[in-house]
Amino acid sequence: MNTNRAFEEAVPQVPGLDFVVLAMPYTLLDQDCLHRGLARCLREGISVVIGSPFASGILAKGSRGGGNCDYGQAPEAVVTKVQGMEAVCARHGVSLPAAALQFPLEHLAVASVVSGAKRPDQVEMNVRALGEATPTAFWSELRTNELVDPEAPTSE
C-alpha cells in the first residue's frame, strides 16, 4: 500500500492478515501511520514490511542528489526537511541512508525493510547502512528539531 489512507482502510477488511507491505507512509520523512495503522498492526499481530524506506530515493541520494520523493520530484519543503536531517546526520557521523533504513525497523510491528537496489554497489551500501551505528543523541536531536514524530520508536 502506498498511502496511509489505503493502509488504514484495507487492514481492517482482511481478517487473519499475517503481514502487509507498506510502500510510503512510514519513513524517516513521513510517520503519518504511526498512531493508527501501525498501532493497529501491533495490537493485532500483523507484521509490516516497509517497501520504500528511502522515500523513492531522496533518503538514499540526499538533498543534492536529485532523488525523488513519493514517486515524483521532491517538493521544496521535503528538500528542506532532508537538509535538516543531513545536518543532524553530519553532527553525529551517521549517513542518511543508515538513518532511513534503520528508522522503520525500530517499530515493533515492522518485520523487515525492502531497500531495493539496481546495482551491486547499492546492495553493498544498504548492507553497510544497516550495520552503521546510530547513537541515541542522533535520534534525540531529530526529535528536538521536529524532524521525526516525537513518539516514533528509536533505539534509546
Where are these regions (language model features)?
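Beta/alpha (TIM)-barrel catalytic core signal, keyed to glycine-rich beta->alpha loops juxtaposed to Asp/Glu
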Residues: 1-155
